[in-house]
Amino acid sequence: MDSDIEMDMESDNDGEYDDDYDYYNTGEDCDVERLDPKRADPEYFEYECLTVEDIEKLLNERVEKLNTILQITPSLAKVLLLEHQWNNVAVVEKYRQDANALLVTARIKPPSVAVTDTASTSAAAASAQLLRLGSSGYKTTASATPQYRSQMCPVCASSQLGDKFYSLACGHSFCKDCWTIYFETQIFQGISTQIGCMAQMCNVRVPEDLVLTLVTRPVMRDKYQQFAFKDYVKSHPELRFCPGPNCQIIVQSSEISAKRAICKACHTGFCFRCGMDYHAPTDCQVIKKWLTKCADDSETANYISAHTKDCPKCHICIEKNGGCNHMQCFNCKHDFCWMCLGDWKTHGSEYYECSRYKDNPNIANESVHVQAREALKKYLHYYERWENHSKSLKLEQQTIDRLRQRINSKVMNGSGTWIDWQYLFNAAALLAKCRYTLQYTYPYAYYMEAGSRKNLFEYQQAQLEAEIENLSWKIERAETTDLGDLENQMDIAEKRRTTLLKDFFPVDA
């Protein structure tokens, strides 16, 4: 009997901590996570930062491998690889299944009249077709017509000898000068691998070696090769250009997911999957929709533009000059939340209500105008918080700059060294990382369907937001904050952040 009572009491005591314990203090698989960083860090991502020369070598190896198998020129090999995301295996398999269809799909040869003879679509037949084109995808008219016989160019209407004409697999023949002018015009417009035949309604692709044979000006040749290289990299799913200004680094990873890559040269961070600013936990498609909506809704800028609000107690105008949303009126010393203007003393228990949008349960029965107003109200709720955290990141950077100046003065006066004060900059860096994640939770919540999963997300979002504001408050008052207290707050905030990402970051989306 007594043992049963004791077990019940233990169970009840455990229940008091269910909310926090279940989400943040399970300690499950701790040993595994220490050994496997992928389990411990939801943002863990293996990648390499490579130079242009490194990537050229990598791509050339793929080209040479395909050349050996199919016995074609590097020019045609690049076309086939470009169309199949640089997957040699896929190209060879399709070549063996239906080589003719492969060449048509890659725009190396034009669609022909349907054939019933299966031999005509075999690899041998396709190879013979390529051999007739010199294995390159183009030929001079002189190869089929005596060089001394003249013909008329359908573009410039000039009559020239046959060796001055070039044609693709489609058979459309044009003089050398017209091809050259056409190529340079296309290159000037930024087109390279997608240059097609000059003939109307013909989409046969011009191979690289024909372009480089006829375009002799070094400037145009360099431009063509630069544009072609960009096309090759963009078509390769495991490669991504660093979006940093004037940066030449290319990131390579076999894990094609929406993880953060940081360039080793310019230190730009971005999403590897889409190349945009890193946006976890929101996936690539949703963030594109959100940013498009933000750009289109111009009235939002006017709504959000004000940097001032009135104190809810004494009504004096207050300007927000820091990143923390825990505000204290300089006049009456009233503590309140910048976002909802609620009393900060009770705000800790009500943070869930502050960050959470309350839908109108009867909205489906309302008029179109009421529904439109409700939709705008919902959007502004999320946008205001999204924009506020963006501004807070900038304001907190200003706080760090002021902090650096104060610490420099202390160091100059003999009050410790820079190493002694490094913990403050570590705290500021963690705060920026946490707030950045929090900012991108709002587009995620905006498009999330109502239900238990959204309720859980908003709960974790509110917990993260509360701990971020606590950390920001302590950093802004760093000189009076206990080191142990600050480090404890850093640990709590990071745990909230990683827990949310583990539960909701759609890395495979």
Curated annotation (Swiss-Prot):
Residues annotated as the enzyme's active site: 324
One Pfam family matching this protein: IBR_1
Zn finger limits (RING-type): 153-202, 311-340
Molecular function via GO: ubiquitin conjugating enzyme binding; ubiquitin protein ligase activity; ubiquitin-protein transferase activity; zinc ion binding
Biological process according to GO: protein polyubiquitination; regulation of macromolecule metabolic process; ubiquitin-dependent protein catabolic process
Residues that, per the record, bind Zn(2+) 6: 337, 340, 347, 354
Enzyme's top EC category: transferase
Stretches the record annotates as Disordered: 1-23
Coiled-coil blocks: 387-410, 452-503
Region (TRIAD supradomain), start-end ranges: 149-358
Chief location: nucleus
EC number: 2.3.2.31
Domain of life: Eukaryota
SMART domains reported in the protein's UniProt record: IBR
Zinc finger region(s), IBR-type: 222-284
Cell compartments where the protein resides: Nucleus
One GO CC term, this protein: ubiquitin ligase complex
Repeat is among the record's keywords: yes
Binding positions (Zn(2+) 1): 153, 156, 175, 178
Acidic residues: compositionally biased ranges: 1-22
Keywords: Coiled coil, Metal-binding, Nucleus, Repeat, Transferase, Ubl conjugation pathway, Zinc, Zinc-finger
Chain residues that bind Zn(2+) 3: 242, 247, 263, 266
Residues binding Zn(2+) 2, per UniProt: 170, 172, 197, 202
The record's note on its domains: Members of the RBR family are atypical E3 ligases. They interact with the E2 conjugating enzyme UBE2L3 and function like HECT-type E3 enzymes: they bind E2s via the first RING-type zinc finger, but require an obligate trans-thiolation step during the ubiquitin transfer, requiring a conserved active site Cys residue in the second RING-type zinc finger. The active site probably forms a thioester intermediate with ubiquitin taken from the active-site cysteine of the E2 before ultimately transferring it to a Lys residue on the substrate.
Family: Belongs to the RBR family. Ariadne subfamily.
Protein name (record): Potential E3 ubiquitin-protein ligase ariadne-2
Gene that produces this protein: ari-2
